[in-house]
Structure formats: C-alpha cells, structure tokens
C-alpha cells in the first residue's frame, strides 16, 4: 500500500499541528496489514508538496528512523536526492543500504517522473539510479505518446540490473501497467477509485485485479487488444477478459489506442501498420490478435498498411474491403503473418439466419454507407438477399452498391439504381420500398452520437404497410433500446438489438483466437449489465 502524504502534509502552511499529523501517520503505518510505501511527492514531480525541502526530509526521518513500525519502502525522487549532499545523507540515514550502521529496515525507491513526455536523458538517469548503492528499487514513469513507448519500457524492465518499476502515464500507457508482471516489473500501481488516481491513466484496483487479472499474468501470457481511436470506452476488454478466465485461457485483452485522422485513410493505415509491425516485432510480448475498430476497419485493407505488415485477408475481407479482426500466425522460422477477418459480417449473417426462415430472396434494407453497412450488405448479397441501401445522399448509397456489385446500372425508377439484387436509394424514399428486414448501420440513436434522440428508420410511417413479422435490427448497442427499436416494439414488430450483434462478432473473434467455444451468454450478460439493461 502506498501512503501518499504530500496532500496531507503540504509543507507550505507551517501548521502547528504537524506533531499530531506525524503521530497519525505513524499509526497508519503501524496498523497497515500490508507493506507500506511512504511517499511525499514534490510538486515539481507531480505531487502536492510545495514546502521547504529540509522540512520534507525531516518529516520522512521522523516516520522512518527510531520508530517501532517503519514503512517497508520510502519513495524519494532521484533529482532531489542528487541535488544536495546534505539531503542525500539524511535520506540515507532513513533507509537500509550497504554502509548503514543502524538497525534500519526501510528500503529506498529512487524515482523519476515526467508528465509531459519520455525524457531525452532517460537512460542516463536510470544508469545513475541503478548505480546508487542506497537504492533498493528504481522507479521511472513518463507520459506515453504511443504504444511504442510501452515496448521500450518493457525492454528496460527486462534488462534492468536491479528491481525496477516502469510505468507509462496517460491513455497510451495502460499496457505498461497491466503487463508489468510479464517483464519483471517490481510492482505496478492502481487507485482505489477513478477519482483517487495519483497519475493519469492509472487503472482502479478492481479493474487491474478483476478485469485484467494481473496476478495471473506471466511470461507466457498471450496478449490481445482493441485497436482504434478512441478506445477508452470499449467494452471489448470486459467481455474478452471474462471469456479468457471462464475458459482457462492464459490471455489478457487491453485497449490499444492508435492516434489517427479519420478523414485521412492513408495516414490512418500508415499509423496502424506501424503499430502492428512494432507489436509483432516485440516477440516477448506474445501478441496474438486484436479487434479493429473505428477508424481503422477500412484502413487495414489499404496499401499503406500492407507496406508495413505481411497480411492474409480472408474472402469476406477481400470482398468487403474492411476488417475488424486480426490474428497473428507464425508462418514458420519465426516470421509472423497477420490473418484478417470481418466478424461484423459473420455476426450479421448469423442474426439474420436466426430471425428468418431464409435470407435468400428476402428484401432487406440497410440504412447507412459506412463500414458496418458494407459488412451487412455483403452478408445479404452473398446469401441471395435482395439488398436496398439507403443513405441521405444517393451517391453514398450508390458507392456502396458499386463496391458490392461492380459498376452500377441505373433503372427506370426515379432516384433509384441497381445491379443484380442490390439497389441504392435516398433515405427519404424508404416509404416506397417495403421490406422484410430493416437494418440501421448509422450512429443515429446512439448515446453521445450526433443525434441520440433521432429515428434512424421512419418506423411510424412504415407501420401501416408492413406485416408484424417484419424485423428491425439496430447495430447501435448503447442504448440497448434505441429510439428506432422502441418504436418498432410499440408497433409489434420483431427486433434485434445492437448488443446481440456486438456479442456475436465478439464470439467469432474469441473463437478465431482461441479455438475454444466462446461463453456467449456470459458476454451478453456482462454487456447488458454494464449498459444498465
């Protein structure tokens, strides 16, 4: 347990109750059933203590020297330790080291922190800290700017000459915190709750021990993740980690943010390609697969991605031009290859098959023109369905139809186009196109989206022309009941919610990675509980 006392003893007040505070801290240390790390972090390294340095050192002496229950560790900054011979001498009196002549049990953690970036002189600082005889443990933490920063942290931990703590701060640094046991990290840090975090990106102890099961992580643990921008709100870590635990699979699944510009597919493809290549090169991580989400589903099929990674897309990915699942396979002699899949298409096919006697010959409307709409359209056309793609702008719908079927042939109906069994129409023409199934593949109705109260499909207007067995399917899963699904249920139509699709695509991913049957009911329950449904 780390006791962060810098906000309790800021040092700038000259408080007359310092003696009482010291006695309170001594009692806390004595009563703690676990080893204590005592830290009074200076303001210049991200803490709250902004008082005189001699007062801070005096406080630490009173808590570590000539007391019945001293802390197990004292964390003190390398920069402050090196700044003054007097401070260095006093800190050395508080801790055990080769020249210590007192009966002292506290050990020194020499630490360094940079909340902005990787320090340019990081390796020099580490060499100084490792060479200090009084330091039992060395700690370094800096703000990660990419996944690559985590990989360097792991390399440092693996080769460290003495016990070392290496942590990445910020959204990009979570991997370093969770995988610390895999690379001999002396320990990692977690907060009791989000509001109590002492560094940006610090997970809660419930997430670290529960969802990520960090105590079960070892050198052979397989690593998976969700690649996207952003990924902090993804529910994939929740369900895949639970699935690994349920099946006894030695794996952990992490958010893997990759910064991207959604408007520049080539740049996005380059960014994700570099990251995937770096992860594959870091063999000790044992990276085995990933989910691919916005904005990389189509970027991963771009030539700019292929320039970095040897890939093998399956037939669905080739036809759709987008992938949402990556599996790393060794093709022999230690050369890995990336297999690409689209489990969105797999999930949509399975759900349509469950909901209908047959897809072949059925008329199905897909609203939207993005990656999910493309996967849905492919699932329908490849199974003989009659597809109608509806978008606000006809050219968007037409472009999607062309990607599915080749060049578009215009028909003689106003505003419509088709080739074979696929047609493109404007969204406001849906009333003229009664169908057996309607699928929303837009963010309309999504919590936090551009139109959370909007109706993606005009259910009320369609209601008088459709039989009750008509199916309304929403790919949005938050909220579980979107405005469109609520309207469909009010009119007695059959519905498929976005949670069902999210779970089905995750099930397909899990089974591709592990070869084990996924615990689908567990996945479904966890997602609905998290969403409050």
Show where each model-derived region lies:
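Active-site beta->alpha loop and helix N-cap motifs at the rims of alpha/beta catalytic domains
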Residues: 3-119
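Catalytic alpha/beta core domains of metabolic enzymes, predominantly
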Residues: 79-222
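Glycine-rich adenosine-cofactor-binding loop
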Residues: 168, 223-231, 342-345, 352, ...
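Phosphate/diphosphate ligand-binding glycine-rich loop within oxidoreductases
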Residues: 221-357
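Conserved S-adenosyl-L-methionine
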Residues: 382-386, 491-493
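NAD(P)-binding Rossmann-fold cofactor-contacting core
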Residues: 385-414
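Rossmann-like adenosine-cofactor binding region
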Residues: 414-495
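Adenosine-phosphate binding glycine-rich loop
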Residues: 467-533
């Amino acid at each position: 347990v780390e006791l962060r006392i810098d906000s309790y003893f800021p040092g700038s007040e000259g408080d007359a109750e310092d003696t009482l505070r010291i006695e309170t801290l001594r009692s806390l240390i004595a009563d703690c059933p676990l080893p204590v790390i005592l830290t009074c972090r200076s303001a210049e390294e991200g803490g709250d203590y902004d008082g005189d340095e001699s007062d801070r050192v005096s406080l630490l002496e009173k808590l570590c020297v000539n007391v019945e229950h001293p802390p197990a560790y004292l964390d003190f900054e390398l920069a402050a330790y090196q700044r003054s011979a007097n401070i260095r001498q006093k800190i050395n009196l508080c801790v055990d080291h080769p020249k210590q002549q007192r009966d002292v049990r506290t050990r020194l953690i020499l630490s360094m922190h940079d909340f902005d970036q990787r320090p340019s002189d990081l390796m020099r600082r580490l060499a100084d800290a490792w060479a200090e005889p009084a330091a039992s443990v060395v700690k370094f933490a800096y703000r990660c700017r990419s996944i690559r920063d985590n990989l360097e942290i792991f390399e440092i931990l693996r080769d460290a000459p003495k016990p070392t703590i290496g942590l990445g701060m910020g959204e990009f640094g979570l991997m370093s915190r969770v995988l610390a046991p895999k690379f001999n990290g002396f320990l990692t840090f977690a907060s009791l709750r989000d509001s109590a975090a002492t560094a940006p990106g610090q997970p809660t102890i419930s997430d670290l021990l529960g969802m990520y099961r960090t105590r079960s992580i070892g050198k052979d643990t397989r690593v998976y993740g969700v690649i996207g921008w952003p990924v902090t709100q993804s529910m994939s870590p929740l369900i895949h980690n639970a699935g690994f635990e349920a099946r006894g699979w030695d794996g952990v699944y992490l958010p893997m943010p990759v910064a991207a510009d959604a408007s520049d597919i080539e740049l996005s493809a380059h960014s994700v390609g570099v990251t995937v290549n770096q992860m594959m090169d870091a063999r000790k991580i044992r990276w085995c697969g990933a989910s691919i989400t916005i904005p990389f589903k189509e970027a991963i099929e771009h030539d700019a991605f292929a320039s970095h990674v040897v890939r093998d897309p399956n037939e669905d990915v080739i036809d759709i031009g987008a992938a949402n699942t990556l599996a790393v396979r060794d093709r022999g002699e230690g050369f890995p290859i990336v297999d690409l899949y689209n489990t969105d298409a797999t999930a949509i096919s399975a759900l349509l098959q469950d909901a209908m006697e047959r897809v072949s010959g059925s008329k199905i409307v897909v609203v939207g023109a993005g990656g999910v709409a493309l996967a849905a359209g492919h699932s329908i056309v490849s199974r003989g369905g009659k597809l109608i793609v509806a978008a606000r702008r006809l050219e968007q719908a037409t472009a999607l139809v062309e990607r599915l079927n080749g060049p578009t042939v215009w028909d003689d109906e106003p505003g419509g186009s088709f080739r074979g069994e696929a047609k493109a129409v404007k969204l406001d023409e849906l009333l003229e196109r009664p169908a057996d199934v309607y699928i929303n593949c837009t963010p309309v109705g999504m919590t936090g989206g551009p139109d959370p109260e909007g109706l993606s499909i005009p259910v009320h207007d369609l209601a008088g022309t459709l039989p009750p067995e008509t199916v309304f399917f929403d790919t949005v899963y938050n909220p579980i009941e979107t405005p469109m699904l609520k309207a469909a249920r009010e009119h007695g139509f059959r519905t498929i919610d976005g949670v069902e699709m999210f779970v089905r695509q995750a099930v397909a991913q899990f089974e591709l990675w592990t070869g084990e049957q996924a615990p689908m009911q567990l996945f479904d329950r966890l997602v609905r509980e998290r969403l409050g449904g």
